[in-house]
Amino acid sequence: GLYYQHIKEMLAERFHMDIRYLEKLNQNKTFKAGEKIMVFNPGKSLQAPISRLVASKADNTLYAYNGKNLIATYPAVIGSTAIPSPTGSYTVKNQVKNPYYRATVVEGTVSKNYMLPPGPNNPVGVVWIGLDKANYGVQGTPVAKSYGKPATHGTLRLSNWDALEIYDNVNTNTTVEFK
């Protein structure tokens, strides 16, 4: 699989923080077994059904609703200028935890397909939530510092921990709106 590259990456993701922040909190630490370190307390995960997600391109934020009540917000990467996200309303079609990823590599006139294994460093992270619009969905990302910066192939990209939280609270009837 595409596992963590080192212990700091694993700890940062587990405690919902950027590696640089983990290092700043633990400047004189070596991150060896038995050593005490300081981490962020992410609190309890959301445990409420999400009936609607609204992706705001204006502020790079994903809003989660239960009925008319806003229950969570997430920083997100929503499309890019080269390949923008769609506009409109879609429905969750499928959900995959620890997905494989098909990559196509083109060299000259030769193109090869590769199937990349699951893991936190998979290009779609640890979650894929497919929409009823082909090739569009909600996904995790192995690059935590990229949220809020438009640089994706039209999908809605979140930190792996936020994508997992959404995965646990949506179903195939959940609406996803892009505005």
Task: Name each region found by the language model.
Residues 1-16:
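Primarily a LysM-type cell-wall glycan-binding module
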Residues 8-9, 19, 23, 59, ...:
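Extracytoplasmic/secreted envelope proteins and their assembly/folding machinery
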Residues 16-17, 32-34, 48-50, 57-59, ...:
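Extracytoplasmic
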Residues 21-53:
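Extracellular LysM carbohydrate-binding repeats and other cell-envelope/extracellular binding modules
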Residues 41-80:
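A structural motif detector for short, solvent-exposed N-terminal "entry" segments of globular domains
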Residues 45, 59-62, 80-84, 96-100, ...:
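Solvent-exposed loop/turn segments at secondary-structure junctions
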Residues 110-179:
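Exported/periplasmic cell-wall-interacting domains
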